[in-house]
From Swiss-Prot:
GO terms for cellular component: cytoplasm; nucleus. The gene is gli3. It is found in: Nucleus; Cytoplasm. This is Zinc finger protein GLI3. Keywords: Activator, Cytoplasm, DNA-binding, Metal-binding, Nucleus, Phosphoprotein, Repeat, Repressor, Transcription, Transcription regulation, Zinc, Zinc-finger.
Length: 1569
């Protein structure tokens, strides 16, 4: 051949050249000719048409005159055909190689056959590829799709005759680009068959490229497979030449001619050529310049035979490069078309310009051992190819059995390890094997063993043993790492001709033969004969040894096959475009086809976490995703480095076991790919692998599922299904759970998840700290720290002192969730160094104030807080915590993380009770005003919007506003007042109480319940007089209220609660009350705040109440006195501020209670009445109206001399009459009860009103109201048999202490008793008093005192006469709360009630403080009973909780229900406080029929219409009050005096409508006129 080429003369060459140039007609060239042509793509061989058999086609003497007629577009034959034809190819002889007259553009040098070098002045006869431009430069033009190709005439092809006969050089291009251009080495012509490397390479090349791609592309590039490795060219020279070519026209212009310039024949040829190169038909090694990270498009341009390059370019500007580079469109060049890439299209296209010089030996190794199929040798992508002998395995032609997969060449594991040692490429993350992965995310793409490839693991040099070409090939299956045909099963050495036969043999003879033992006995299997759990697992495992890949891609043009079905499924997503794995980071919509990619994305993009740690001893590498880790393990540590199953369970997560041979990591090093044989890529079966693949990492649920979180299946981001990007099946890479390592101990996280609502747990004391320091989560903490820094910029002092670990609370087990909080709660070490600084509690409180605010917390880390958790507070994040229970020794969840909202890892946003520390100020203990201040401070600190102004704020005096906005009163450590009493007093024991009883929710009977769940109201008889939900004033030491406050009626409409209301006022009420109290110093009267009409109305109403109450009290003092055996101690303990209960205050409070509540500042959850609330949600007006309605738990012991001595005297006298002992007590009571008498500020007048009301004015509110308002006095008069209820911590009153003589002696006790009992007392007074009195008689009957008072009382009660104690009256009126004459039910219920009371009385002193069954107790006692039970229920163990539990309770309860039904008369139901608000003064008396509305519920439920939304139908209000699902805890419904429906009402609305409501409020006031 070489001689012949030399023999041609220059003149001949010129002649031939001319003829070629002039020849315009094109001979018809079949696809086969094109495929086999070694010349330009547009081989214009003037000779005969070429046939598929290259030898013949190329051997045919080209005839210059003939033009290429038509090119058949039939796709190239299958790999099988190609394989069979490879050796049949003959090159037509090239007779003349005309000497180039002029160098082609840029300098296209024709190869001088004499020396194999390009001589610019030597023009081949063929002018071989004048039409080919220099290789396509990979530059911006390509990426932008702006590279245009200019087709040029194709000269006739002249092939030297010698070449034609040489089977050795079928595909060799005829010119070689060499910077040398040195003809001196003419003797070295590579075309010389004797060339030492030609034969091996040619055979190999032919076997690899039976299609024209090799010859055409190689020639097109001016690069001959033989020439490249030629010893005459140095890497530097070759690279230099490549560089020269890079600037010239691309030889592909002819292959991909522009439509305009390319003739139809040319286009056909090009298309044909492309189809021939199509991966499905002509799989070729794929050398991806840079594997793309992008998912593939669902459509594949090559799937259609009519592939249109222009269309592809138009569709994806970067697609051209993708095609050329076989890349899935790298990140730089997006627009990839799925698995299609240049390499997929043609091996020729795979020949990227190798930036790195490739030495002959390197080339040899690459080709032979790596099977990069020439593509690697002539690597397309310079950046990826490296001179290192180990080139990333490129795709071998799947159909060519002779072609060994890069992996097939199983260089011994050691070799593999060496070669695999991170050739930069293999080390390059996700630049996986150039041939195998085009960075395609489908790991399996590389895995297909070429069917014909023999397992070359034995070849020491990486020389692949090519078995007879193509006999064994699985036509479309890509080259596998292993193509085993010999059985290496223990004791079996059978050899088979095909892999299929081997597989069949193994399955039938070995696997099924050992039916009960699923053990791989393959020699050298890394599983070490560990049995599989199931047969299918073993079957799948064996594919690793045999290289079988039964799962083939069904998409046209894709020849990928996988050994595992899940890998195929993942791969198919590259075709379908399905991306089921969506980034879990909120706001990020990226989706991925596999979980591994998502994990990688999340960990790289949204965090710096690298949870996947290499477990190989001494290796400290960490990765963001399992695929990268697997790749690292395979690449760096070798195939044998995979972790065995036994390691999986270890604390130390094992490194991911190497992928199955078919699923190699993206950049699998060549040696590693041989793992299929040696290393057990899938040491586990699917199941195992699944387990492994899950990586057992449970990403911490960050606040918004931001950081790497478990994939949809709960698996960690590492998903079993291999992500196309991660080219390896997720073998089980386990997250390093070592606290010292990667992600820290996630088990710890699982136990104590980072609190969602907490602020960065590590940086601020605001969050509960995980039980362990999780080093692995430090990144999370860092994120939170960054987040906090932003906030801290605004909150510089945000809890500057980290929470002390020493005082950490014991695990709260109340909910079964144990959270060790570092937050110092209770009186623990001051967590809040500066009271002016927002503490964690403060922040918590702020968040709790935002009832609906699941996301309000700006502090809560976007990463670490659950979006669902409302608060940043570790403790009170429950956005609707119905009760922040105190920690005063009670077992309650600090942050009921699991209580009710399993979604939130932190505190349940609706936890019915977030516990609060006893003594530490908490939101729950704040008054609305304080809350407002806190919110304002928080807003100022965080730059947030100011809080919604308090109701009536516009009417508040400047002083009051300043007080609201000013710092809280002397709180010990924070702006928040200390918690003296439970928020709802549901805890029973206030911080000051020496002891308290278990709350219903603490008992199993009550259990934890969702705040919104209705609660069977407990009779409050056991509770310490329930205090305001926020304990607003209870926890605050209010300023002294000057005596002048005669009628400090809070003019906030319908504040109808007394200080001692068993159902403490809601926040709304507290707000108003707080404001008033804060102004108390200024002695602002209602007149200061309310319109004259309102004031007048309130005054008139109060007068009536005073009178009624006074009368009742006087009448019943003596009898009631007997029940009083309270010790001043408990009273004192209850006393939060004696001063606070000045007469004015009482009056103020009461009047305040009469006003409608508008303040909706806090979430309903915070205002909820704890489970101890009245069973029916009825709020007994008596209690509500009690002067101490807000201070139910406050046994304020007023030692102040009553301002209204007269009323006291009257009451005293009255008591005296009924109870000889009463005088002293009464005196004390009255003295002490400035609270009621003085506070009422009305003295006699008030009593008179009460008397009038209770005795004669059933219309006034049927004593239910008078009891509500008057029983304060009456109970005063009746210091209460409820004296039994020792409501204080010192509630140690017991049956033994029933001595009434002591009662007489305990003067203050009466007051205290009265004060404490005010709430319960009213109930007792209204319901239980009879029974209690009798109980006093019964239990304390030994005491004549008791007997006297009690008897007199009972007798009067039984008489049913007008002289009946107000109890009977109250009970009747209460029963008839609907406004009906109390005798209606009196006849029926009173005697019955009395009986019941008698029965229950017996239980009075037997009450077990622990027995919180009061909820089930009859609300028989109805509102009063309920109030009573609610108040007593926790207040004293001694007080008979069981009073409410008598066997006859059901009947009483029925009565209550009846009453309730009466009360719920829709015609009378109006918005809370409707009784006061809209009715005119005239209506009030008659309309105050005790309409029962869940006042607190409505008030606290911010979802209702605006605060003053105009007239609402009573039924609506009723529904709101009783049925509001928003209510965290049903409150006792307020029994409001009925008001004609016609009158307009106020409804509690959203805070958002507060402004509007304020405006409407004025309107309402106007209406009042």
């Amino acid at each position: 051949m070489e001689a012949q080429s030399r023999s041609t003369t220059a003149s001949e060459k010129k002649k031939v050249e001319n003829s070629i140039v002039k020849g315009h007609s094109r001979t018809e060239v079949s696809e086969k000719a094109v495929a086999s042509s070694t010349t330009s793509n547009e081989d214009e061989s003037p000779g005969q048409t070429y046939h598929r058999e290259r030898r013949n086609a190329i051997a045919m003497q080209p005839q210059g005159g003939q033009g290429l007629g038509k090119i058949s577009e039939e796709p190239s034959t299958s790999s099988e055909e190609r394989a069979s034809l490879i050796k049949k190819e003959l090159h037509g002889s090239i007779t003349h190689l005309p000497e180039p007259s002029v160098p082609y553009r840029g300098t296209v040098f024709a190869m001088d056959p004499r020396n194999g070098y390009i001589d610019p002045h030597y023009r081949s006869d063929l002018d071989l590829f004048p039409a080919f431009h220099p290789p396509v430069p990979i530059d911006a033009r390509h990426h932008e799709g702006r590279y245009h190709y200019e087709p040029t005439p194709i000269p006739p092809l002249h092939v030297p005759t010698a070449l034609a006969s040489s089977p050795t050089y079928p595909d060799l291009p005829f010119f070689r680009i060499s910077p040398h251009r040195n003809p001196a080495s003419a003797s070295d012509s590579p075309f010389s068959p004797p060339h030492p490397y030609i034969s091996p390479y040619m055979d190999y090349i032919r076997s690899l490229h039976s299609s024209p791609s090799l010859s055409m592309i190689s020639a097109a590039r001016g690069l001959s497979p033989t020439d490249v490795p030629h010893a005459g060219i140095s890497p530097a020279e070759y690279y230099h030449q490549m560089a020269l070519l890079a600037g010239q026209r691309s030889p592909y212009a002819d292959i991909f001619p522009s439509p305009a310039t390319a003739g139809a024949g040319a286009n056909a040829l090009h298309m044909e050529y492309l189809h021939a190169m199509e991966s499905s038909r002509f799989s070729s090694p794929r050398l991806s310049a840079r594997p793309s990270r992008k998912r593939t498009l669902s459509i594949s341009p090559l799937s259609d035979h009519s592939f249109d390059l222009q269309t592809m370019i138009r569709n994806s500007p970067n697609s051209l490069v993708t095609i050329l580079n076989n890349s899935r469109s790298s990140s730089s060049a997006s627009g990839s078309y799925g698995h299609l890439a240049a390499s997929a299209i043609s091996p020729a296209l795979n020949f990227a310009y190798q930036p790195t010089p490739v030495s002959l030996q390197q080339m040899h190794q690459q080709i032979m051992s790596r099977q990069h199929s020439i593509g690697s040798a002539f690597g397309h992508s310079p950046p990826l190819l490296h001179p290192a002998p180990t080139f990333p395995s490129q795709r071998t032609i799947p159909g060519i059995p002779s072609v060994l997969n890069p992996v097939q060449v199983s260089i011994g594991p050691s070799e593999a390890a060496q070669q695999n040692k991170p050739t930069s490429e293999s080390a390059v993350s996700s630049t996986g094997d150039l041939l195998h992965n085009k960075r395609s995310k489908v790991k399996p793409e590389e895995d297909h063993p070429s069917p014909g490839a023999v397992c070359i693991q034995d070849q020491p040099d990486g020389m692949t043993l090519v078995k007879e070409e193509g006999v064994k090939d699985e036509s479309k299956q890509e080259a596998e790492v292993v193509y085993e045909t010999n059985c290496h099963w223990e004791g079996c050495s059978r050899e088979f001709d095909t892999q299929e036969q081997l597989v069949h043999h193994i399955n039938n003879d070995h696997i099924h033969g050992e039916k009960k033992e699923f053990v791989c006995r393959w020699l050298d299997c890394s599983r070490e004969q560990k049995p599989f759990k199931a047969q299918y697992m073993l079957v799948v495992h064996m594919r690793r040894h045999t290289g079988e890949k039964p799962h083939k891609c069904t998409f046209e043009g894709c020849s990928k096959a996988y050994s595992r079905l899940e890998n195929l499924k993942t791969h198919l997503r590259s075709h379908t475009g399905e991306k089921p794995y969506v980034c879990e980071h909120e706001g990020c919509n990226k989706a991925f086809s596999n979980a591994s990619d998502r994990a990688k994305h999340q960990n790289r993009t949204h965090s710096n976490e690298k949870p996947y740690v290499c477990k190989i001893p001494g290796c400290t590498k960490r990765y963001t995703d399992p695929s990268s880790l697997r790749k690292h393990v395979k690449t760096v540590h070798g195939p044998e480095a995979h972790v065995t199953k036994k390691q999986r369970g270890d604390i130390h997560p094992r490194p991911p076991p190497p992928r199955e041979p078919g699923s190699h990591s993206q950049s699998r090093s060549p040696g590693q790919q041989t793992q299929g044989i040696h290393g057990e890529h899938k040491d586990l079966s699917n199941t195992t692998s699944k387990h492994e693949e899950c990586l057992q990492v449970r990403s911490v649920k960050t606040e918004k599922p931001m950081s790497s979180q478990p994939s949809p299946g709960g698996k960690s981001s590492c998903s079993r299904q291999q992500s196309p990007i991660s080219n390896y099946t997720n073998s089980g890479i386990e997250l390093n759970l070592n606290s010292g390592g990667s992600i820290g101990d996630f088990s710890a996280l699982d136990e104590t998840p980072i609190m969602d609502s907490t602020i960065s747990t590590a940086t601020t004391g605001l969050g509960l700290h995980g039980r362990r320091v999780m080093t692995g989560t430090k990144w999370m903490e860092q994120i939170k720290v960054e987040k906090m820094k932003q906030v801290n910029g605004m909150l510089p002092r945000l809890n500057p002192v980290p929470p002390h670990r020493a005082p950490t609370l014991p695990p709260i087990t109340g909910n079964g969730v144990q959270l060790n909080s570092n937050i110092s709660l209770g009186g623990l070490a001051p967590v809040l160094p500066n009271r002016n600084d927002l503490s964690s509690m403060d922040i918590t409180v702020l968040n709790m104030l935002n009832r609906r605010d699941s996301n309000t917390s700006t502090i809560s880390s976007a990463y670490m807080s659950s979006r669902r958790s409302s608060g940043i507070s570790p403790c009170f994040s429950s956005r609707r915590s119905s009760e922040a229970s105190q920690f005063e020794g009670r077992v309650q969840n600090l942050s009921v993380a699991g209580s009710y909202d399993p979604i939130s890892t932190d505190a349940s946003r609706r936890s019915s009770e977030t516990s609060q520390c006893d003594g530490l100020p908490t939101l729950l203990s704040l008054t609305p005003a304080q809350q407002y201040r806190l919110k304002a401070k928080y807003a100022a600190a965080t730059g947030g919007p100011p809080p919604t102004p308090l109701p009536n704020m516009e009417r508040m005096s400047l002083k009051t506003r300043m007080a609201l906005l000013g710092d809280s009163r002397d709180c010990r450590l924070s702006p928040l007042p200390s918690v003296n009493v439970p928020r709802r007093c549901s805890d029973g024991g206030v911080g000051s109480y020496g002891r308290r009883h278990l709350l219903p929710n603490e008992l199993q009977v009550n259990g934890m319940r969702r705040a919104s769940d209705p609660v069977k109201m407990v009779s409050d008889n056991v509770s310490n007089t329930r205090v305001v939900r926020f304990n607003s004033l209870n926890n605050v030491i209010p300023p002294d209220v000057p005596p002048p406050m005669e009628r400090r009626n809070l003019s906030l409409q319908n504040y109808t609660r007394n200080v001692y209301s068993p159902c403490p006022p809601s926040i709304s009420e507290n707000v108003a009350l707080e404001a008033m109290i804060m102004e108390a110093e200024g002695n602002f009267d209602d007149e200061d705040l309310l319109p004259d009409d309102m004031v007048q109305y309130l005054n008139s109403r109060n007068q009536r109440l005073y009178e009624t109450i006074e009368t009742d009290a006087l009448q019943n003092n003596a009898g009631e006195r007997n029940g009083n055996n309270f010790e001043q101690s408990h009273v004192t303990s209850n006393v939060i501020n004696e001063q606070f209960h000045s007469s004015e205050q009482t009056d103020l409070i009461e009047n305040k209670n009469d006003l409608p509540i508008q303040w909706n500042e806090v979430s309903s959850g915070s205002a909820e009445y704890s489970p101890s609330r009245l069973k029916y949600g009825q709020r007994f007006p008596t209690q509500q109206n009690q002067p101490f309605g807000l201070y139910n738990n406050m046994m304020v012991q007023q030692q102040n001399v009553p301002k209204s001595g007269l009323s006291q005297q009257r009451g005293y006298q009255h008591h005296t009459q009924n109870n000889p002992q009463a005088p002293q007590q009464n005196l004390d009571l009255y003295n002490n009860s400035n609270v009621w008498s003085g506070q009422l500020g009305r003295g006699n007048q008030y009593i008179d009103d009460i008397e009038r009301s209770s005795l004669g004015h059933s219309a006034t509110g049927s004593l239910c109201n008078s009891a509500a308002r008057g029983q304060k006095l009456t109970t005063n008069g009746l210091p209460m048999n409820t004296g039994q209820q020792n409501f204080g911590p010192s509630t140690h009153y017991s049956v033994q202490s029933a001595n009434r003589a002591e009662v007489v002696q305990n003067e203050n006790i009466i007051n205290q008793e009265f004060m404490q009992q005010m709430t319960a007392e009213h109930l007792i007074y209204g319901m239980h008093l009879l029974g209690v009195t009798r109980s006093n008689q019964t239990t304390s009957g030994q005491n004549g005192n008791t007997t006297d008072g009690t008897r007199s009382f009972l007798s009067t009660t039984q008489n049913g006469g007008e002289q009946q104690p107000t109890l009977a009256k109250n009970f009747q009126s209460f029963v008839n709360s609907s406004g009906n004459s109390r005798q209606n039910l009196h006849r029926n219920n009173l005697p019955y009630l009395q009986e019941q009371i008698y029965d229950t009385n017996q239980h009075i002193f037997k009450v077990n403080s622990i027995k919180m069954e009061m909820q089930s107790h009859p609300q028989q006692h109805c509102a009063n009973a309920q109030n009573f039970s609610g108040q007593l229920y926790d207040q004293t163990a001694t007080y008979p909780q069981q009073i409410m539990k008598s066997g006859s309770e059901p009947g009483m309860e029925a009565n209550c229900l009846l009453q309730e039904s009466n009360n719920t008369n829709s015609s009378k139901l109006l918005s809370p406080g409707a009784n006061h608000v809209t009715s005119t003064v005239d209506n009030i008396d008659n309309s105050l029929a005790g309409v029962q509305i869940a006042f607190a519920a409505i008030i606290d439920d911010g979802d209702h219409a605006s605060l003053i939304s105009g007239v609402l139908s009573p039924s609506i209000i009723q529904n709101l009050s009783r049925n509001s699902s928003r209510l965290t805890t049903p409150r006792a419904s307020l029994t409001f005096p009925a008001i004609p429906v016609s009158t307009s009402n106020m409804a509690i609305g959203d805070m958002s409508s507060l402004l509007t409501s304020l405006a409407e409020e004025s309107k309402f006031l106007a209406i009042m006129q």
